[in-house]
Regions:
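Hydrophobic, aromatic-rich alpha-helical transmembrane segments
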Residues: 11-22, 46, 50, 54, ...
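Residue-level signature of catalytic and energy-coupling elements of molecular machines
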Residues: 19, 39, 126, 195, ...
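Helix-coil boundary and interhelical linker segments in multi-pass alpha-helical membrane proteins
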Residues: 38-52, 91-102, 241-244, 342-344, ...
Length: 432
């Protein structure tokens, strides 16, 4: 039955490993249950219920992750996208002046367009057009990106007006807890302790109690109603230029963030074939697209596949059972919100850093002596953490790949799809 439901093969997979991987993925994603409502609190004065946002965030994660589990049978968690939620609140609503109902309508339309692109296999066509070298670079770039996120969340890396970033004060507070957690989790991983990443998160959170970083604000609570934001759409502005721009922006960022995440994590999980293709990728895209539409109905910003899924993959998750376990955790989180929200961001830092290391492994398969391949790969890798964007890393990498190989006369390496995409990406940077 497990094989039919989740693609589980008893000769290759273990139930315990898949479940532990799912829990690990959840714990690395759980921060958004606190962050997302906090970001949307800026719209409270415009009538968007912040408490309802918490419930919609969890429900969107549940629906999206279950779709990934049962339909795509992949070990990935989905939830409202961090970054796109800020675009929703601060750009569409607060800067452009549109209502949150307008923004939800844009997300619904974006999700519908995603479904069309997936049904016509346009998204799969784009992925297949990306050279294997860049796919490996995408995985490595995401590794650096999530490690950077982890270090930033703990305050180990902080802002600096002169150098943009610098090292934080690691003698106390979250930064110290993050450092302790990295050492603790590293030892567990090196000693091959089963469930080392999950134990690392929980152990770091417990250490944070006497440091006054981890604080428990209760255990059980009734989930707030989503009625105030459920299916709140505004269709009378859908033909405006602003709606087109907003929909395109959501679509563009979500498409390449999701594509980068799926390609990177699938590569790390050993799901990529020697020819660079990933079996079942179109189903994963469809799950992501439908989840975005469902999320809009629930009152959530764009729902997407989370890069933190790499934590579960690193823990051994390979099937839909991992995603199902993650979804179950989100169901539990609805009723144990105060408890789950007690896990500080610094407690997830060790996992994000170590998983970042794990995801660097595809670099060894990049031919660093072939500069026509190595330079675009390096640009892809380094631009993700430096621009704080997976999609920008992919775009810069693909533009440089086409430009370098075209000017060097390596036309046989290039296909029509990647050349067209490179031109579109250049136009995007010029005009948008």
């Amino acid at each position: 039955m497990l094989e039919k439901l989740f693609g589980f093969d008893a000769s290759k997979h273990k139930v315990k490993t898949e479940v532990m991987a799912g829990i690990t993925t959840f714990l690395t994603m759980a921060y958004m249950l606190a962050v997302n409502p906090n970001i949307f609190s800026s719209l409270a004065s415009k009538g968007m219920d912040t408490n309802a946002v918490f419930t919609s965030t969890a429900l969107a994660a549940i629906v999206g992750t279950l779709l990934m589990a049962f339909y795509a049978k992949k070990p990935f968690g989905l939830a409202p996208a961090m970054g796109l939620n800020a675009f929703f609140v601060f750009t569409v609503c607060l800067t452009m002046g549109y209502s949150w109902q307008f923004a939800l309508t844009a997300i619904l339309i974006e999700g519908f367009l995603f479904v069309l692109l997936t049904v016509t296999k346009v998204r799969t066509l784009i992925v297949d057009a990306i050279p294997a070298t860049l796919k490996r670079a995408i995985g490595a770039g995401i590794g650096l990106f999530i490690a950077f996120i982890g270090l930033k969340n703990a305050g180990i890396i902080v802002e600096n007006s002169a150098t943009y970033v610098t090292i934080g004060d690691m003698t106390h507070g979250s930064a110290l807890l993050g450092v302790i957690g990295i050492v603790l989790t590293s030892v567990l991983v090196i000693r091959r302790v089963p469930g080392s990443l999950l134990i690392g998160i929980l152990g770091t959170a417990l250490i944070g109690i006497p440091m006054n970083i981890t604080s428990f604000n209760g255990i059980v609570d009734t989930p707030p109603s989503i009625a105030p934001i459920f299916c709140q759409f505004e269709f009378h502005n859908i033909l405006t230029i602003d709606m087109v721009i907003v929909v395109f922006s959501f679509l563009f960022i979500d498409m390449f963030d999701t594509m980068g995440t799926l390609v990177g994590v699938c590569t790390k999980a050993g799901m990529m074939r020697p020819d660079g293709r990933i079996p079942g990728l179109n189903k994963a895209f469809m799950a992501d697209a439908v989840a975005t539409m469902a999320g809009a109905c629930l009152g959530s910003s764009t729902t997407t596949t989370y890069v933190e899924s790499a934590a579960g993959v690193a823990q051994g998750g390979r099937t839909g059972l991992t995603a199902f376990s993650t979804a179950v955790c989100f169901v539990v989180a609805l009723f144990f919100a105060p408890l789950f929200l007690s896990i500080p961001a610094a407690a997830t830092t060790p996992v994000l850093v170590i998983v970042g290391l794990f995801m660097l492994s595809p670099v060894k398969d990049i031919d660093l002596n072939n500069y026509a391949e190595a330079i675009p790969a390096f640009i892809t890798i380094v631009m993700m953490p430096l621009t704080y964007s997976i999609s920008d890393g992919i775009l810069c990498g693909m533009i440089s790949y086409v430009a370098i190989n075209a000017l060097c006369g390596n036309w046989r390496k290039l296909n029509v799809t990647i050349c067209v995409l490179a031109v579109l990406f250049v136009m995007k940077y010029i005009f948008i």
